[in-house]
A protein has these predicted regions:
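Helix-coil boundary and interhelical linker segments in multi-pass alpha-helical membrane proteins
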Residues: 211-224, 268-288
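Acidic (Asp/Glu-rich) catalytic motifs at the cytosolic membrane interface
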Residues: 224-270
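Topogenic membrane-insertion module of multi-pass membrane proteins
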Residues: 135, 139-221, 231
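Conserved beta-loop-beta/alpha segment of the NTase-like Rossmann-fold superfamily
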Residues: 42-106
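Residue-level signal for inorganic ion chemistry
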Residues: 19, 78, 195
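Conserved core of the sugar-phosphate nucleotidyltransferase
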Residues: 80-142
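N-terminal glycine-rich phosphate-binding loop and ensuing alpha1 helix
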Residues: 1-45
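Alpha-helical transmembrane segments of integral membrane proteins
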Residues: 198-201, 221-224, 252, 256, ...
Length: 288
C-alpha cells in the first residue's frame, strides 16, 4: 500500500497489536491457520498461542509464497476490524469468482485474491498499491477501517471499535443513554490489567447491594444503585470485546449476577412492604 506498514508494528488497541487482533479474530471465527508476510523473523503472539495453541502461522517474506496455491484474504497490519466486520467481509467474498479489493469509506486495506490469479499487464503481487488499483472494488455492509501514518498513536482505532461495540440485542435505552456513560468508563478500563470477569464481579456486588436499601425503606437510593449497576454492567462486555477476552463463562457469570441483582431488588421490596413500620409508603418514606 502507499503507507509504510513497518510503522504499524507496535500500534496497539487494548494492549493488543493490530496484527495479533486480526489473528485472534480469525482463530475465534474458526480459522485454523494464517500466513504472515513480514521481514521480522519469528514474531511471537503470546495471547494467540495461549488461547489457540493449535492455530498455525506460516511466515514468509514474500507474498508470492502464498499466491496461486489457494484463495487468500490479505489484511494489512494497519487494519482495524471486529468480528462482525470480518463476517460481513467473508459474506461478500463467499461467492466471488474474481479477485477483489474490500473497500469502505476509504480503502480498507483488505484484498481477496483468487487461486491462479494472473495479470496480463505484469502487475507485481508484492505491490499492494498496484493490486488495489487493478482489482475490482466491493464494499461489505459493515466495513473495517485502515489507519494512516498520521493516526499512529492516536485513539482513532480505539474510538472506531467503540463506535461499533453495541450488541444487536441491546435495547434503545442501553445504546442511546447508558452507553454515553459506560463507554468513557470502558475507555479507561481497557488501559488497566483488570479482567472483564473482575469488572463483572464488582458491578454485580453493586447491583446486589440495592436490595439492602429497598429493605430498609430507602427505595429511591436502591433504584439509583440498581440503575448505576445497569449502566456499569455494559463495561465488562465492552472491555471484553475490545480486548478480545469474551468467553462463555464470562457470559454466564454476567447473567448469573444480573439475576442475583434483580432477586435482591424484589426481596428488598418484599421485606419493606411487609414491615408495618414502613407500610404504607408515604412521600417521606419513598424519598428518605
Amino acid at each position: 500500500d502507499s503507507e509504510n506498514l513497518d510503522l504499524f508494528i507496535n500500534e496497539k488497541i487494548g494492549g493488543l497489536s493490530l496484527t495479533e487482533r486480526i489473528l485472534l479474530i480469525l482463530a475465534s471465527e474458526g480459522f485454523s491457520n494464517a500466513g504472515l508476510i513480514a521481514d521480522i523473523p519469528e514474531i511471537s503472539f503470546k495471547r494467540l498461542k495461549k488461547k489457540y495453541p493449535d492455530f498455525k502461522i506460516h511466515q514468509s517474506k514474500n507474498i508470492s509464497d502464498f499466491v496461486n496455491k489457494e484463495d487468500i484474504l490479505i489484511f494489512q497490519n494497519n487494519v482495524v476490524i471486529n468480528k462482525k466486520q470480518l463476517q460481513s467481509t467473508l459474506d461478500i467474498i463467499k461467492n466471488q469468482k474474481e479477485s477483489t479489493t474490500i473497500r469502505g469509506d476509504k480503502n480498507s486495506g483488505i484484498l481477496f485474491l483468487k487461486k491462479n490469479i494472473s495479470f496480463s499487464d505484469g502487475t507485481n503481487y508484492s505491490d499492494l498499491n498496484s493490486l488495489n488499483a487493478t482489482l475490482r472494488k466491493i464494499e461489505p455492509k459493515d466495513s473495517p477501517i485502515k489507519l494512516s501514518t498520521s493516526e499512529i498513536g492516536s485513539n482513532t482505532g480505539r474510538d472506531f471499535l467503540f463506535d461499533h461495540i453495541s450488541k444487536n440485542v441491546s435495547g434503545w435505552f442501553s445504546k442511546t443513554i447508558n452507553s454515553k456513560i459506560s463507554i468513557p468508563i470502558s475507555k479507561v478500563l481497557i488501559k488497566t490489567s483488570l479482567h472483564p470477569n473482575v469488572i463483572t464481579f464488582i458491578v454485580g456486588l453493586i447491583g446486589i447491594s440495592c436490595g439492602i436499601f429497598y429493605a430498609i425503606n430507602m427505595p429511591f437510593i436502591g433504584a439509583l444503585i440498581l440503575q448505576t449497576a445497569t449502566i456499569l454492567d455494559r463495561c465488562d462486555g465492552e472491555v471484553a470485546r475490545i480486548k478480545l477476552r469474551e468467553s462463555k463463562f464470562g457470559q454466564w457469570f454476567d447473567t448469573a449476577l444480573d439475576q442475583l441483582s434483580y432477586f435482591s431488588m424484589f426481596l428488598g421490596i418484599s421485606i419493606c412492604m411487609n414491615n408495618p413500620k414502613f407500610f404504607p409508603f408515604t412521600a417521606d418514606n419513598i424519598i428518605f
